[in-house]
Design a protein with these regions (language model features):
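P/S/T/G-enriched low-complexity
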Residues: 1-220
Length: 220
């Protein structure tokens, strides 16, 4: 248990907070009305909460379309004419938070609130570093929100490289991000770099190169 006086996030959730979320909807046949309804219902039920972790979301998307566990609805990767497509959509940059940045104390010296990569100040069993820093060159002794973003960006870059090497077609979309904001511009660049090359379109700025499958959606 944490030391007496350690602050916790306020709200109605108890120790099981975030552990009772709705399971991911598996691949669903949308060639029939029932399948379409199932997907739309799942989308309508989604609610945003907490920080932004793009690599975690993309990783689960990859798992859903794969033919292996924990999801088994995907066709075999070796099947001809079978494209594995993952669409990565986000409205912000990767974020991970120190307790103090959210108004909490950190008497347990966890260095971050608990999220998908665990605590930033605790080594996960079997790892030489806290999981958020594992397999990156990012400093594992800089416990700041900005450094956590760098670590997540590094995780995202590695994931994108591995996904495309495995044959996934990666489409990326940012929502209302601004190139004039340095943090948002960095996320836009990361998303563009993650996206696959178009098989048909050319880069409007250089016709010798394929266009990237990245879009920044703007407007209300």
């Amino acid at each position: 248990p944490a030391p007496s006086g350690t602050a916790a996030a306020t709200g109605s959730g108890g120790p099981n907070a975030s552990c009772t979320t709705t399971p991911i909807t598996p691949l669903t046949d949308v060639s029939n009305a029932a399948g379409v309804t199932k997907i739309k219902t799942a989308i309508d039920a989604m609610q945003s909460n907490g920080a932004t972790n793009v690599p975690e979301g993309m990783a689960w998307g990859w798992r859903v379309v794969s033919s292996g566990s924990p999801f088994t609805e995907g066709r075999a990767e070796s099947e001809k004419g079978n494209d594995k497509v993952v669409i990565v959509l986000t409205d912000g940059a990767n974020t991970y938070y120190t307790p103090s940045s959210l108004g909490y104390n950190d008497l347990a010296s966890n260095k971050s609130t608990y999220s998908a990569y665990g605590y930033a100040g605790r080594n996960t069993p079997g790892y030489s570093k806290p999981r958020i820093f594992q397999d990156t060159s990012v400093s594992s002794s800089d416990y700041s929100n900005d450094n956590y973003t760098k670590a997540l960006n590094a995780q995202f870059t590695t994931l994108c490289t591995n996904a495309k090497a495995a044959g996934l077609l990666v489409l990326t979309v940012s929502l209302d991000l601004s190139a004039s904001n340095s943090t948002e511009k960095a996320q836009m660049d990361a998303l563009k770099g993650c996206s696959s090359d178009s098989r048909f379109r050319k880069d409007p700025a250089d016709a010798t190169k394929p266009a990237k499958l990245y879009w920044n959606a703007t407007g209300s």
